Regions:
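Hydrophobic cores of alpha-helical transmembrane segments in multi-pass inner/ER membrane proteins
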Residues: 98-104, 161-178, 258-265, 324-340
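Individual transmembrane alpha-helix segments
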Residues: 61-100, 242-259
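N-terminal signal-anchor transmembrane alpha helix
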Residues: 9-46, 200-213
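Membrane-interfacial catalytic/cofactor-binding modules of polytopic membrane enzymes
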Residues: 206-253, 258, 268-271
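Interfacial helix-loop-helix junctions of multi-pass membrane proteins
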Residues: 28-39, 135-157, 213-222, 294-327
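Small-polar-interrupted transmembrane alpha-helices in polytopic inner-membrane proteins
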Residues: 13, 17-21, 121-141, 197-205, ...
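Membrane-interface helix-loop-helix junctions at transmembrane boundaries of multi-pass membrane enzymes
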Residues: 110-124, 189, 268-286
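Membrane-interface transmembrane-helix boundary segments in multi-pass integral membrane proteins
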Residues: 242-249, 253, 310-335
Length: 345
């Protein structure tokens, strides 16, 4: 197919841009910037305040629409507000830019009749997932635009994060399907099932990672290997597996240990397998990433009492890199899942 390589690189550009968007989302959350823009204007919202009067109006909206200002940021100056506004504005505008980078080449490829029939439903799904992600983001922000909440709902935050990862995973899989020759793939049903199981565990872990972020649960137990002096904290008796910071923290740590062991086992199995040069080059990448991820998680917990309000210190850096490595781990495992099929075809 004449345009297959170009379509593949177009999709890979989308993958890179989605990764950047998730990073920007993490920075927006860590700097406390997510509630700074209190309106949702998909088109006109791309234009920031252009003069002092516009800035004061935007600041007044933030003051009146959020409990966050009243109870947490009442000492803010206009300069402070401009800092948090910038990150939320950049996060939203990068999403708009992704839309442009999707639609313009799509129109050109469509005009050139470059798409195969099996690509069309996938492209429609990509478009729907992208639009849905924008809507989910606004629904999340709305949960924080009240007099009672300092932050957005941690449950809606988790939905927003996981839906972004679904979009990333779908685009990444689509790109691999276009770019990787079938000769690079092999069949091993048991290995394929094991990777699928680990991805399921990782999805649950990522949900709890978002809960950790939304509930500020790292600072609720800034100790390791124990959790505030106990390995099985009293809070487990509450059996609130979604809303209690200590319980969420316990689940996130426990899943990390299980995933670490599972991926080490996966790497031992991959070492016994032959395969293409591509496979041999990247088969141990999940193991490397999970080692880094565990260290980052421990470091983030131990530094969680040193958070900077509306700033970026050591904890914020560790937490942000922790999120980035999580995305790479998802992509690495999907790469394994793609290269090692469930059956011959």
């Amino acid at each position: 197919m004449q345009y297959r390589k170009q379509i593949g690189w177009w999709l890979m550009t989308g993958v890179i841009m989605i990764v950047i968007q998730v990073v920007l989302g993490g920075i927006t959350r860590l700097t406390g910037s997510g509630l700074s823009i209190t309106e949702w204007k998909p088109i006109l919202g791309s234009i920031p305040p252009m003069n002092e009067a516009d800035w004061n109006h935007a600041f007044d909206l933030y003051k009146t629409a959020t409990g966050q200002y009243k109870y947490l940021n009442a000492d803010f100056t206009l300069s402070d507000f401009k800092f948090i506004y910038f990150w939320e504005w950049l996060h939203r505008n990068w999403a708009r830019f992704i839309g442009v980078v999707f639609l313009l080449p799509f129109a050109w490829f469509w005009y050139k009749k470059a798409f195969t029939p099996e690509m069309v439903p996938k492209l429609i799904a990509l478009f729907v997932l992208g639009i849905a992600q924008g809507l989910i983001g606004w629904i999340m922000v709305k949960s924080g635009l009240t007099d009672d909440n300092l932050y957005v709902s941690h449950i809606r935050l988790a939905i927003h994060f996981v839906s972004a990862l679904v979009l990333l995973a779908f685009t990444w899989w689509f790109a691999m399907d276009v770019m990787i020759p079938s000769s690079a793939r092999q069949s091993n049903p048991s290995y394929h099932r094991w990777v699928t199981f680990i991805l399921g565990l990782l999805l649950l872990q990522l949900v709890y990672g978002a809960f950790m972020a939304g509930l500020k649960a790292a600072s609720a137990a800034s100790t390791w290997p124990d959790i505030n002096g106990s390995y099985f904290p009293e809070a487990l008796k509450h059996q609130n597996w979604v809303n209690h910071p200590i319980v969420v923290h316990f689940v996130h740590r426990t899943l990390a240990y299980v995933l670490f062991a599972a991926i080490i086992f996966l790497s031992i199995q991959s070492a016994k397998m032959g395969g293409s040069v591509l496979w041999k080059k990247w088969r141990f990448f999940p193991m490397i990433l999970v080692f880094i991820q565990v260290l980052l998680g421990i470091g983030s917990v131990l530094m969680a009492t040193e958070t900077q309000r509306n700033g970026f210190g050591a904890f914020e850096w560790a937490a942000q890199i922790h999120q980035i490595v999580a995305m790479f781990l998802v992509m690495a495992l999907l790469f394994h899942l793609y290269l090692v099929r469930d059956q011959k075809s």
